[in-house]
Amino acid sequence: HGWLLENKDADKTMIISHGRGVNRLAAMQYLQIFKDTSLDKEYSFFIPDLRNSGKSDISRTKMGYCFGQDIYNTMLMLNEKFGKNNFVLYGFSQGGMGSAIAAKIFNNGLRKKGIKVDKMIIDSSISNIRKKVKEDAKKRRVPKFIVSVVVRVFNFRVGNKLDKLRLSYLLRRIPTLIIQTKSDKATTYGMLMEEYNEIAQNKNVQLKVFERGSHTRIYAEQDYKEEYTEAVANFLKDKEVNSAQEETNEKNIQEAETVKVEADENANDKGSEYYEKFSDFDFDDNE
C-alpha cells in the first residue's frame, strides 16, 4: 500500500519511508520541503505504508530489517508497474535503516532489474542494530545471559546478517545525508557517532546535526524548519550541506564522547514519548 505522486517529466522517484508505529501520513509533511525549494518538479514521489503500519499487514519489523525488504520490494513494484528505475530513498528511524539495508543488502537484486539508488537521506536512523537490541534489553533490565540468547535468535531471524546491519557497513558507495539531533533518546547521537567515525572520511557521506528536537521530529521544530529544508535541498543539488564539513566532523566526534557517557548514565530512562512506539524489542513475543 502507498501513494504515488507521479510527475511525468521526472526521471527520478523519491520513496519517503516512515518509522515504526506510524504510517504514511507521518511522511506527508516532508513533501513541503520539495515545494518550498522547487524540487517537487524533479521527482515523482512514493509514500508507502511499510509493514506493521497503516493498511499494511501486521508483522515484525526487526529493527528496520523488514522495512528494508519492503522498500526493496517497493522499488521492484514501481519498476515493474511504472517503469521507474532511478530512486532516492528518504527514511526516518527504522525507515532510515531500512533504506540503507534495501540499497546495500539487496543491491544485487536491484542491479539485475537495472534499478539504481542515486542518493539517500536518513533522519534519526538506527545506526547499529546489534547495539540497539542490547540497549533496549538493558532498558528493560533483561539479564545478560538472556540477552546473548536474544541476540543469537535475532541474528538468525535476519538471515545471519546482524553484523552487517550498521551504518558503517551499509553507507559507503551511495551519496548519503545523515540527519540527527543530539537530544534523540530513541536513536542516540552517541551511538550514531561511533558508526560515523568509521566512515567520516568518506566524501559520499555527509552529516547534519541539530542541537535540539526529538526523534524524527527535527523538521517539526519551528526554529529548524528552514535549516533542515536547506540541508536537504543542498544535498539533492550536489552542494555541500555543511560549509565547514571537516570542522563539523571534529566537533561532533568530540561531543559524541560526552553524549555517550550521559546516555550510559541514563540507560534506564525511556524519556521520550516516542520510545514505546519506536522500540522493537517485542520481536520474540507470540511467534
Question: Where in the sequence are the language-model features?
Answer:
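Alpha/beta-hydrolase active-site loop
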Residues: 61-81
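The serine-hydrolase catalytic nucleophile loop
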Residues: 20-34
